[in-house]
Amino acid sequence: MAKIGILTCSNATQDLGCSSVSCLADFRKRKETFSEYPEDEKLTSAGIINCPGCPTLTSPDKLIERIRALTNFGVDTIHFTYCVKSLCPFKEKYKDSLEESFPNIRIVIGTHEEHIAPEEFRRRVKKLFRQPRKTMVDIILNKDEEA
């Protein structure tokens, strides 16, 4: 039985509302990177965790601690989501650090089928981040209901 953990991009999940629905759909259907597991091997989701956020270029310690939480539940493989694969400039450093810290855990970069080319995906995500957004300050200043 494969016990799989999924590492998501906190910008994608917390700021942009990604629910990991495509990752989980391909997990259930054994598509894309999940098709690499033998058909007769049961796949179990050990959990989904968010990356601690950008940047941790000098020290991936926060990420290592989050992964350690999954190791307590017997995870044997961590999949980086498509969002991490396409958006994260630190993914290779994270992968190397995790492989060093957890030599018995396999790290896979990718989850679901790429419905959009990475370059187009990055362009569209960048556009989402640039949209004006209301905050608590807008409520305090009574500007939250302006068009």
Roles of regions detected by a PLM:
Residues 60-92, 96:
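Mid-chain, well-packed structural core segment of small domains
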Residues 92, 99, 122-124:
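A generic membrane alpha-helix/interface feature
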Residues 1-70, 84, 105, 113, ...:
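Conserved mixed alpha/beta catalytic, RNA-binding, or beta-rich assembly cores of soluble enzyme
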Residues 98-107:
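Alpha-helix-loop-beta-strand connector modules within alpha/beta enzyme cores
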